[in-house]
Amino acid sequence: MKNCMMADQRGRSILQYQPIVGDEALEFSRGLAPSTFGFRYAAYMDRNHFLPSGRTAVKHIADPTLAYVMTRYRQCHDFVHIITGCGRSIEEELAVKIFEWKHTGLPLGLLSLLGGAPRLSAAQWAHIRLYWEWASRNAPSSRHGEPAVPMYLNVPWEDMLAKEYDEVVAYTGITPLPDFLEKRQKH
């Protein structure tokens, strides 16, 4: 993950400045217009009774840069829920974990899939194929040397809070899962 961040201009900047998403970002987001990315973030966090400060600190990683990369991975998880349009059902959480695995290569996403699979009905399990396709289409990619879909750790989410949600979607190139599923139903 560190190498992917170092290979991207925005990622290098994030590693240099190491922004931390704190409770003040959530407080700021609560006052934003309903059409903004930040408002959706605040609504998600409040609905689930989450606080950015509630995440357990990264431990057992001696290298400070690698420790920050893991901190960023954890802090960006809530932003991934917002940009992908996924809630917190088991199915949606598994979709997010597949998405994260496609972006980071961390096996945690696949392990979550294995752990969550027994809790899924046959119909829900059938949806996993669609989620896999969606995550694959939203994996980091580039066109003509420029990121078409950046690795989500390289997105300056903390700078996106006041932007319109649709603008952030366009910036990231990520298709929210509900939009993907709606298009699939039409075809």
Swiss-Prot record:
The lineage of its organism: Eukaryota, Discoba, Euglenozoa, Kinetoplastea, Metakinetoplastina. Component of a multi-subunit COQ enzyme complex. InterPro entries: Coq4 (IPR007715), Coq4_euk (IPR027540). This is Ubiquinone biosynthesis protein COQ4 homolog, mitochondrial. GO terms for cellular component: extrinsic component of mitochondrial inner membrane. It comes from Leishmania major. Its main location: mitochondrion. This protein may be expected to contain an N-terminal transit peptide but none has been predicted. Its cofactor is Zn(2+). Keywords: Lyase, Membrane, Metal-binding, Mitochondrion, Mitochondrion inner membrane, Ubiquinone biosynthesis, Zinc. It catalyses: a 4-hydroxy-3-methoxy-5-(all-trans-polyprenyl)benzoate + H(+) = a 2-methoxy-6-(all-trans-polyprenyl)phenol + CO2. Belongs to the COQ4 family. Its EC number is 4.1.1.130. GO terms for biological process: ubiquinone biosynthetic process. Pathway: Cofactor biosynthesis; ubiquinone biosynthesis. It is found in: Mitochondrion inner membrane.
